[in-house]
UniProtKB/Swiss-Prot annotation:
Pfam families, per database record: UDG
Subcellular location: Cytoplasm
EC number of the protein: 3.2.2.27
Stated name of the protein: Uracil-DNA glycosylase
DNA damage recorded as keyword: yes
GO cellular component: cytoplasm
Major site of localization recorded for this protein: cytoplasm
Homology family: Belongs to the uracil-DNA glycosylase (UDG) superfamily. UNG family.
TM regions (residue ranges): none
NCBIfam families: PRK05254.1-1, PRK05254.1-2, PRK05254.1-4, PRK05254.1-5, ung
């Protein structure tokens, strides 16, 4: 579980891979991957950071832990691999997108197009045991992903943080730089979406901020596969 980051995140996060918590986490993961089915695949664990470099991050959408069903997780929060049914929270995200922009709901949940435009799709925990939600919670990933958020907080260039639900909003304490923007609402989960996610217009809010900064707006439309 050494530093495999191939872009500017590599040197920024290099110290984390030497820290006690990470060495303990790495030993735990070696054991977990050899004795259980764990998602995502080892080579996909850091995909959020691989697809969206530090310098290119415009938006952060914070998730919790990876999907724990077969062939779903591939290292990007909320996203699933091609050929897999779109999960309920992501379907609600698409419904809000349809209401904001009129986009048709796509036939897939593969969000790489967002990541490639500077949307960091970051879970706070990067691995999970099959069928056991939160099974890798408290094992060390939170220290690592907190550091990712702190590094973005240190940046002069503004970042837009999208915090949906209490779990994501708990990270607000790490975002202290007044340059940055926070967009928050309840989670898009079917349990809460009708209590303030629907109608919150997060996608157009992001693009309004980017346009005001003179930055290229995000094309949120996910193509059919």
């Amino acid at each position: 579980m050494e530093n495999v980051l191939r872009n500017d995140w590599g040197p920024l996060l290099a110290p984390e891979f030497e820290k006690e918590y990470y060495l303990t986490l790495s030993s735990f993961l070696t054991e977990e991957y050899s004795t259980h089915v764990v998602y995502p695949k080892v080579e996909d664990i850091f995909n959020a950071l691989q697809y969206t470099s530090y310098e290119n991050t415009k938006v952060v959408i914070l998730g919790q832990d990876p999907y724990h069903g077969p062939n779903q997780a591939h290292g990007l929060s909320f996203s699933v691999q091609p050929g897999v049914k779109t999960p309920p929270s992501l379907l609600n995200m698409y419904k809000e997108l349809r209401d904001e922009y009129g986009y048709e709901i796509p036939n897939n949940g593969y969000l790489v197009k967002w990541a490639e435009q500077g949307v960091l799709l970051l879970n706070t925990v990067l691995t999970v045991r099959q069928s056991e939600a939160n099974s890798h919670k408290g094992k060390g990933w939170e220290h690592f992903t907190d550091r990712v958020i702190q590094l973005l907080n240190e940046r002069e260039k503004p970042v837009i943080f999208i915090l949906w639900g209490r779990h994501a909003q708990a990270k607000k304490k790490l975002i202290t730089n007044p340059n940055h923007h926070i967009i928050e609402s309840v989670h898009p989960s079917p349990l809460s979406a009708r209590r303030g996610f629907f109608g919150s217009k997060p996608y157009s809010k992001v693009n309004t901020i980017l346009a005001n900064m003179g930055e290229r707006e995000i094309d949120w439309e996910i193509p059919n596969l």
